[in-house]
Structures are given as C-alpha cells and as structure tokens.
C-alpha cells in the first residue's frame, strides 16, 4: 500500500446528499476520506437541489422505512447542531387520497403500527383547516405533525463543511474515469489523478449505472419537473399554514410544499411523463407541456396557489423496478459498496444513508436493517453482506437485539423481532389486499379491516406503491 502516497481509508464517488453525509460520517470516525464529485458542490444536475425536499414520518411505502426515518430525524438534528443552521422545517404532512387508496391506507397503517401521532381528516376538513387546499370532499387524509421539509443545497454544504472540519478531502469538478480492485483495496482513476483506498463507496445518483454495470436497468434515470407558482393568496401557502403533501388524485400522484426561499408554491407529479434515459442526456429544460400538466393540477386542487409561474425546473429521479432503494456491497468486491435507485423518495434519508454507507465502508456490515434494499432481489446474485446474514440465520446466531430484523416486514420498535410476513399488516404494506377504512367504536379513531383472503388474490389486487 505504501507505493501510493495518495491512499485513503475510503473514497466516495458522488458528493450530493448521500455522498456528503457519507464523507462526514467517515470523517467523524477518524477515517482518511476522499470525496470526488464531477460537477460543482452543490450542483443542480442531479437529485439534491430544488430549495426544498419533503421529510415525513408517516410512510405508506413499506414498514421497514420507519426505523430508518427515526434515525434520519436524529441525524438531521445532529448536523443542524454541528453546522448551527436550521435544515429541517416542520409543517406537518398530509397523505391524501380516496378512502380505499394505498396512499391513505398505507400512511394510516404506518401511524397505527408505529404509534405515531396522527389525525384522519376528510377533504372538507383539510380545506377548512388549511384553506390553500381544495381536495375532493370525500377524500381522506392522514395528518402527521412531524412531517415537513429539508433544505437540500444547504444540507449538502453543511455536511461538506463538517467533513472538511474533521479532515476530509473533497474535490469538485473531478470526473471518475475508471476504478479497479487492487487486492483487498481499490485503485481509482480520475481526469486529475490516481488514488488508492481500502474501501470505495458509490453514491453517484443517476450516474451509478455507468460505473457499476450490474445496475443498468435496475437504477434508471428519469426526468422529473417541478413548478413554483406565485399564489394569489400567499398567506395561505406559508409554512405555518400549509403542510407538505402527497396526494393521489385521478390525474396522478402529486407532492408539494409551502412557499419557501423563492416566491412560489412548489409541487410536482411523481414520474411526470415517465421519460427515462441516460443521466447525461436527459433534458434539464422545462417546456410548456410540463407547465400545462402541473398548472391544471394546481388550478383544480390549489386554486389560490395557481398564479403566475415563477420557476419551472427539471431534476432526476433514479428508479428501481420496485421503487425501493438499492444499498449493498458489490457482489464480487466487498470493499466496494453502493447506494442507488432512491426512486423519488430518498433525500429525507440522506443523513442515515451516510451512516449506513460509512458502516459498509468500515466493516462491510451495518447496524441498520437494509434487507429490503439488497441487490439479490433483482439479480439473484447475493452479496457478501447478505450471505453473512443468511449464514448467521442458519446457525441461529442472528438475534434482532444485536443485529436488527432478519426480515424486512417487521413491526415497530415496541415489537421488534416479531415477523409479520404473512399477516394483514405485511400484506397491507405490500398493497396486495383490499381493506376498508372505518371509525373504530365510539372513539372516532380510524382503523383498517381486512376484506379479502390472500388465497383469493388476483393480479388486479397486486398494486405496487408507485
């Protein structure tokens, strides 16, 4: 190893949200770390910009996310203390849709299962409490008070500055040309220099598939467009009067934010026009047809927010086939790890992803349950990380108390270690079984009741969360 003076404990490729947090976590462990970013730090060509990003504790996508979210909130508070800057703003969050929709049911179930404070509101009640909203009266919404938004560009800067203060070396405008295993270590070649490291971490967003060919087709870049419209009644769209939202309506699934940083109410449609391609070539321009589909939504459901257009901006999603993340060790080289495919709902996790990736770089294992995110679910090729877990399970050496859940479908912290893969809760989060939402007794609380036997499921019952 001494043949190369530019040797590091870890090199991180891609210094956006995930990479900057990873550099910080490694540096605070006294590791010699190098971060390499091909663009500016921060930049607006990937998925870590746009003034605001939603964070929410109610999570309809899958129960495995809740434990990570709790840790993510803790770590965002940690970097706020370190930087002296507010990065997380709590507005509350609303997950809205028809009573039988997977958005509403999944959000409610996550609150019930994990004992999160929440309220169930009708569309009419939402509009009464938050007059900027004009949802269908018969729709239902879960309000969870811990939701809000993060400031992405400032988050990246905060992590980079904190990493610098701990001795990390971070280079912008330096492009990766190639990498190769070098015994148990790696060699990295850029357009400026050559380096070696004990571990290599890829957090390169839409560019991951270019340097990890096995991710091609599994972490696919997609063009996404956001609008900022000047409200005609701006007082209704201030953070204290306008929760962040995820709304499922006949036109699609939309998400949005109060006015912050720029004079516009920000919102977008998930998977906009489903335009996929190479991160390098997908258009970052926004066009009239982009504006039209977004403006039509605002005019119908947020009419007091549908004033003049302030900004139209494109960014990237990087999607997996099932819209769950990809976080794992390289299947052939365990000194290499990657975090990819955050599918439009990853930024909020950046703080905990940094901790996970630092774990993988340091010891090729993590304290967190990331079994939902393994590569083998698509390829059948099991990484060393998950082979270790399966071997421990076979020996009876895996204990939830010491290692976390062995199965991705677990209840909350109060019932950790109790699997529910075949029960109604597990099925609900997979969105495979219809349910009825109804008031529970005289308390006015809402609950979910099974209305179908899983033995009688049909293809039409199987609904992926996106």
PLM regions with names:
Residues 52-129, 139:
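Dinucleotide-binding Rossmann-like beta1-alpha1 core, especially the glycine-rich loop
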């Amino acid at each position: 190893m001494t043949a190369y003076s530019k040797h590091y404990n870890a090199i991180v490729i891609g210094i956006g949200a995930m990479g900057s947090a990873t550099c910080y976590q490694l540096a605070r462990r006294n590791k010699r770390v190098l971060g390499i970013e091909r663009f500016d730090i921060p930049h607006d060509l990937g998925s870590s910009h746009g003034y605001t990003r939603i964070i929410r504790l109610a999570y309809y996508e899958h129960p495995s996310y809740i434990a990570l979210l709790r840790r993510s909130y803790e770590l965002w508070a940690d970097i706020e203390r370190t930087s002296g800057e507010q990065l997380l703003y709590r507005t509350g969050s609303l997950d809205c849709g028809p009573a039988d929709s997977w958005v509403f049911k999944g959000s409610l179930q996550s609150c019930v299962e994990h004992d999160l404070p929440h309220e169930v509101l009708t569309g009419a009640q939402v509009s009464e409490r938050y007059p900027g909203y004009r949802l269908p009266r018969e729709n239902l919404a879960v309000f969870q008070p811990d939701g809000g938004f993060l400031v992405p560009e400032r988050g990246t800067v905060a992590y980079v500055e904190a990493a610098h203060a701990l001795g990390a070396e971070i280079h912008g405008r330096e492009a990766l040309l190639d990498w190769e295993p070098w015994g148990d270590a790696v060699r990295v070649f850029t357009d400026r220099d050559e380096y070696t490291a004990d571990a290599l971490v890829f957090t390169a967003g839409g560019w991951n598939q270019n340097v990890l060919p096995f991710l091609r087709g599994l972490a696919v870049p997609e063009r996404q467009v956001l609008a900022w419209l000047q409200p005609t009644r701006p007082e209704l769209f201030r953070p204290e009067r306008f929760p962040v939202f995820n709304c499922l309506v006949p036109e699609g699934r939309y998400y949005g934010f109060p006015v912050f940083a720029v004079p516009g109410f920000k919102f977008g449609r998930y998977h906009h026009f489903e335009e996929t391609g190479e991160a390098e070539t997908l258009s970052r321009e926004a066009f009239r047809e982009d504006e039209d589909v977004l403006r039509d939504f605002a005019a119908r459901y947020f009419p007091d927010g549908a004033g003049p257009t302030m900004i139209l901006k494109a960014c990237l999603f990087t999607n997996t086939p099932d819209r769950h993340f990809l976080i794992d060790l390289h299947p052939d080289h365990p000194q290499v790890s990657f975090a990819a495919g955050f599918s439009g709902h990853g930024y909020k996790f950046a703080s905990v992803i940094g901790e996970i990736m630092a774990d993988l770089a340091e010891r090729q294992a993590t304290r967190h349950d990331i079994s939902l995110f393994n590569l083998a679910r698509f390829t059948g090729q099991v990484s060393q990380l998950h082979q270790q877990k399966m071997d421990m399970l076979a020996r009876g050496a895996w204990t939830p108390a010491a290692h976390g859940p062995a199965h991705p479908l677990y209840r909350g912290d109060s019932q950790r270690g109790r699997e529910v893969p075949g029960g109604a809760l597990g099925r609900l989060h997979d969105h495979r079984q219809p349910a009825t939402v109804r008031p529970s007794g005289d308390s006015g609380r809402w609950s979910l009741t099974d209305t179908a036997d899983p033995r009688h499921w049909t293809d039409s019952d199987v609904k992926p969360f996106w």
